[in-house]
Amino acid sequence: MALNDLAAKEIFQNIDPDLDTLVGFSGGPDSTALLFGLHQLKINNRLNGKLAALHINHGINSQANAWESHCKQVAESLGITFFSEHVTIKSKSKSIEIEARNLRMEVFKAYSRDYKQICLAHHLDDQVETVLFRLFRGTGLRGITGIKLSRIIGEGFLIRPLLHTPKDALIDYLKSHNIDYLIDESNLDQSIDRNFIRKSVMPLIQSRWSAAANKIFDFSKLAHEEIEILDTLFENVYGHLFRSESLIKSELVNLDSPLRRKLIRHWLEFHKLPIPNLKILIEIEKTFLDSSSPNAEVQWSRSDDEQGVILRINKNEIYFEVI
């Protein structure tokens, strides 16, 4: 039961076959296709490390326990080691979706001690939705690069081997082999922004421009490549400024405004701090570079309120405090 050639090629190209692999398995169509695809590689001796599936039960939906049972049954039917973890959403002050994602990442980080390669089933359509969502919400150049193919998490890597594969290819594979998968009804709720983009915006766009999804995806890849080049050049010239613990006002005041803002963003990124939007960046410029108040400060936080920052100035040095 081979996954179609395109998806199978993408999976194999984007993973390390010698690492132990853990699949984030919700039971939905995407993660089901990924699990079966990796299982096919395993039985064909193209995946040398261990293969396991991890289901995270958020306990939100009334069907949550039934979904967990389904995932366990599927994994065991394939002879794949199965893990499940229950997480509890506590906060009511922020998006449930954001908190659920943060909790999942903590679980993945814990499992990275034993499984150095954690695979998630994001696909091309997810990438397109992410780019559009960020554009509509407001983002910079880095935001339009979308979802990363891979990144470090804990002691391993988080990889999305299907990121270049359209969802239709995954659905066709599942249907052609009569593979069951779960449907989360919340994904149909168009009061949720991403669902609205998926169910209403993209179909309308593609009814006019049939290749729109691929073009948006290619655009995000090109943006990523261009940003990498610019970052390298920028660091070669200005790296000594943003790698320090503080910014020196006298070294910034005579620079053009776009360059000053880029330096501030890179400085904050280097120290793994929340990146402010354009409005706050302009406020930072006015507060610290275009005036000289000794008690000035600018404060902001991440969109999920998990971390906040205050910038202050002491004579010629602009420094940060995490709150």
PLM regions: where:
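Non-catalytic, well-ordered alpha-helical scaffold segments
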Residues: T32, E129-T130, N195-K199, A213-F217, ...
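AMP-forming adenylation/ATP pyrophosphatase catalytic core
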Residues: A2-D30, N48-A52, V87-I89, L103, ...
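Core alpha/beta nucleotide-donor-binding catalytic domains of modification enzymes
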Residues: M1-K199
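Mid-to-C-terminal catalytic subdomains of enzymes
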Residues: I171-N214, D218-K221, E225, T232, ...
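Active-site catalytic microenvironments for nucleophilic, acid-base chemistry
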Residues: G37-N44, L204, W267-F270
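Alpha-helix boundary/capping and short turn/kink residues
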Residues: R137, L141, K167, Q206-S210, ...
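Non-catalytic, surface-exposed connector residues within folded enzymatic/regulatory domains
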Residues: N65, K94, S191, S210-A213, ...
